[in-house]
Structure formats: structure tokens, C-alpha cells
A protein has these predicted regions:
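Condensing-enzyme catalytic core mediating Claisen C-C bond formation in acyl metabolism
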Residues: 1-25, 160, 215-276, 281, ...
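N-terminal extracellular/periplasmic Venus flytrap/periplasmic-binding protein-like
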Residues: 11, 23, 27-32, 168-253, ...
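Conserved beta-ketoacyl condensing-enzyme motif
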Residues: 22-85, 89-93, 97-98, 102-106, ...
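Short, well-ordered amphipathic alpha-helical segments that serve as non-catalytic structural scaffolds
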Residues: 26-41, 61-65, 90, 151-158, ...
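Conserved catalytic cysteine-centered active-site region
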Residues: 53-103, 145-150, 208-235, 315-344, ...
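Active-site-proximal alpha-helical scaffold in enzymes
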Residues: 64, 82-112, 159-189, 242-249, ...
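Flexible glycine-/small-residue-enriched beta->alpha junction loops
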Residues: 105-157
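Active-site pocket-lining segment
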Residues: 156, 263-332
Length: 402
């Protein structure tokens, strides 16, 4: 089975809904990022492109995006809809294809526009067309008999099940904002953000946040004893992000040093009433399969669409709580749905690189109760070079004298 590496990645800056990208179709946004990533590595086009997308108009946005980006028509491209986890699932699928030897280099990630999310209407012969409002923007995540499937209510139920208080959720939101602000000020992500349309700043980052402001934030649900507010839930966003996955052979033929090696992945079905808790369940399964403990990892990137996700992690894993979302998470940057998986993977690679880490995991909970996680190991340039030299030495034929 072939080894799979992450050569690197690029993302757009993340726009708020009806912000800087409000008129930009997701395939245009994603096409520019995909093209720039190929150009960065001197690549005309990959062997394939896999795109995550959750709220687009349908069709195959992956193929549309590829063509919008001016990449070769010979390159196959397809789209994955695993809601919030779509981009990370795209990376998972790309890794499997390279492991199997089908392709050598694949672009995987996602593109999303909450600003241009289309409205749909139930067909006349659908029993739901008789509803008072037959127009909808989001499809069902689980059957009606399971109860209300709204993500906000799922997060409230998860907070209650995990025993998360409003104060703990607000604390998680404040920490995320402070860490993201520092990362932005220090320019730690500067080389992986593609400036587009005259900007490179993530729009959702707040200029100031405090405990007092968090405490004054109004609740966003009528859930009894609910804890969710506009300040401890993520914004809805526009953005695109892609990573380049490649086989060892492809990288060595081009004398490229990868950022990380993919060491494993997991996808798990969980309680559909408590979707935010599925990310940590996926990580727990993955680490168990690999014989690892949480303490073996140097960084955890969880897509914290709701503060309950990060607050729950810190409550369960106190000894490694400081390793979660070291540069902030979705509570600060926002959540461009299908692009978020590649976005947090890019952040994870940069964190391991900057902080001399070895192992890290990216994880996302998805609507409907599916968790996705991908484990990576940072590649040290010196070790990569030494490994190549050892391989070269063993491959030199010996002169035999008779």
C-alpha cells in the first residue's frame, strides 16, 4: 500500500455571509484556490480533484470548479456532500485513492458560499409541499420521526448531555478569539492564505471580545436552560480551501519535501440527536485503532462550530486541553461548511511545522451525527532527505568482479 503525503495547501480568506464574497460563486472562489495551489507546485493539473460542498445548487461543483480554475479537462473531478465534514471526507477519499495506487497526486478540499445558498421548493407531489412554508434552504439531516434536526438544537442537547455550562461555552469562545487574533497579528497563516479581490483578512475575526460582551450576548434558541448565543456559536461563511495529496514516488521524482504524512483516518456514525459530539468519538476510535493516547498528539484541530465542541474536549481531556485549536477555531474564523475540513487541515500542518510537533489530528462533526477524523505526522525535512539518501545508496548496483 502506497504512503500518502500532504505536499501543502492554500485557502481563501474566510468571508462572512453577505460580506466580501457575497457576489462570488463558490466554483469561482474554489477554482482560483485550486489553480493557485497547482501553480505553487509547478503542476499543470492533478490526477483528480475532490471537492466538498454542503449548500450549493447541486450538480457537480467539483467539476465546475476545476474548469473555472482553468485546469485541464482531462482531470476527473467529483463532489462530496457530508455537510460540515465534506472537505475532510474529500481528503479521506483522496488518501484512499493514492494508497490504492489509482492516482499519484490529488487536490482535495472544498468550496462554499453561504451568501449564495439557493432556496428550494418542495415538489407539488411531495407531502411536505403543503407546509405553511414549502420553501427551504437546508435538506433534512434525519427522518422526521426522530424529532427536530436543527443543528442549533442538536448543539443545545449536546451541551446538556455533556454538562457544559454557559460560562464554559463563553470561555471557549473567548479563548478561540484571542488565539486567532494572535495568529493573525503574528502572520502565522500568511503564506497559506491566497489574497483575493483586494483582501486577505478573515472577516469573521472580531477586533475585540471580552467576558462582559460574551455575557451580554442574547440566546439564539428557546431550548430550556439553553446556553447558545450569537457569540459562542460560529458565523456562517464563504470560502474555499484545498490541500495537495501525493504519493512518495511523485514527490521524490520532483525533489519536493512534503509537510506531513497521513497516518490514518476514521469516519463514525453517532447519535443523530447530538451531532457536535461525533468529532471526538471519531478521534477516540482512530487513536484506539492506532494504539495511541491523546497525550501522544501535539495538536488537535476540531471544527468548533459550537463552543460545546471545544468545551467538551477540554472537560474530557484536561491534560491536553491546551493543544486544542492552538491558533483559534471556527468560533473565531467562521465555518465555510464544505471548505472547513481542508481549512483546519492547513492550520494543523502549519501548527506542527511552527511548533516542532510530530502528530496531530483534524476532526469535524457533521449534521446528522457523523464524525470524521484524519491523523497526520509532520515530515522533518532533514529526515526526509536522509531517507532519500539511504534509498539511493541501496539502489546503486554493485560492481561484481569475477
Amino acid at each position: 500500500m502506497n504512503r500518502v503525503f500532504l505536499a501543502g495547501g492554500l485557502r481563501s480568506h474566510i468571508g462572512i455571509r453577505n460580506g466580501i464574497f457575497k457576489h462570488i460563486r463558490p466554483e469561482v472562489l474554489g477554482g482560483r484556490v485550486a489553480r493557485a495551489l497547482c501553480q505553487k507546485y509547478g503542476l499543470q493539473g492533478p490526477d483528480a480533484l475532490i471537492c466538498g460542498n454542503a449548500v450549493g445548487p447541486g450538480g457537480n461543483i467539483g467539476r465546475l470548479l476545476l474548469l473555472e480554475g482553468g485546469l485541464p479537462e482531462r482531470v476527473p473531478a467529483f463532489t462530496i456532500d457530508l455537510q460540515c465534514a465534506s472537505g475532510l471526507a474529500a481528503i479521506h477519499m483522496a488518501a484512499l485513492s493514492i494508497m490504492a495506487g489509482e492516482w499519484d497526486v490529488v487536490l482535495a478540499g472544498g468550496a462554499e458560499s453561504a451568501s449564495l445558498q439557493p432556496q428550494r421548493r418542495y415538489a407539488d407531489n411531495d407531502e411536505r409541499s403543503s407546509l405553511r412554508n414549502p420553501v427551504f434552504t437546508a435538506a433534512q439531516f434525519r427522518p422526521g420521526e426522530y424529532g427536530d434536526d436543527a443543528m442549533l438544537l442538536g448543539a443545545e442537547r449536546a451541551a446538556k448531555a455533556a454538562g457544559i455550562t454557559r460560562e464554559e461555552a463563553d470561555e471557549a469562545a473567548l479563548l478561540s478569539q484571542e488565539r486567532a487574533k494572535k495568529a493573525a497579528e503574528e502572520g502565522w497563516l500568511k503564506d497559506v492564505i491566497l489574497p483575493l479581490f483586494g483582501s486577505s483578512r478573515d472577516e469573521a475575526l472580531r477586533k475585540r471580545m471580552s467576558e462582559k460582551l460574551l455575557a451580554r450576548a442574547p440566546r439564539v434558541t428557546d431550548f430550556p436552560e439553553g446556553i447558545l448565543t450569537a457569540a459562542n456559536t460560529c458565523t456562517i461563511n464563504d470560502g474555499a480551501a484545498f490541500v495537495m495529496l501525493a504519493s512518495e514516488r511523485w514527490l521524490r521524482e520532483r525533489d519536493l519535501v512534503p509537510s506531513a504524512e497521513i497516518k490514518g483516518f476514521s469516519m463514525i456514525g453517532a447519535d443523530s440527536a447530538l451531532p457536535p459530539l461525533s468529532a471526538d468519538l471519531a478521534v477516540s476510535l482512530l487513536l484506539r485503532e492506532k494504539g495511541l493516547f491523546y497525550s501522544d498528539l501535539d495538536a488537535f484541530e476540531y471544527n468548533e462550530a459550537f463552543a460545546v465542541i471545544s468545551a467538551d474536549f477540554r472537560k474530557k481531556h484536561r491534560d491536553v486541553a491546551d493543544r486544542l485549536n492552538r491558533w483559534g477555531g471556527a468560533l473565531a474564523y467562521g465555518h465555510p461548511y464544505g471548505a472547513s475540513g481542508a481549512e483546519i487541515m492547513i492550520h494543523l500542518m502549519k501548527i506542527l511545522e511552527r511548533e516542532d510537533g510530530n502528530l496531530g489530528v483534524a476532526a469535524i462533526p457533521a449534521a446528522g451525527g457523523v464524525g470524521e477524523a484524519v491523523l497526520i505526522h509532520h515530515v522533518d525535512e532533514r529526515e526526509w532527505t536522509e531517507e532519500r539518501e539511504r534509498h539511493t545508496a541501496f539502489s546503486i548496483p554493485l560492481e561484481v568482479k569475477l
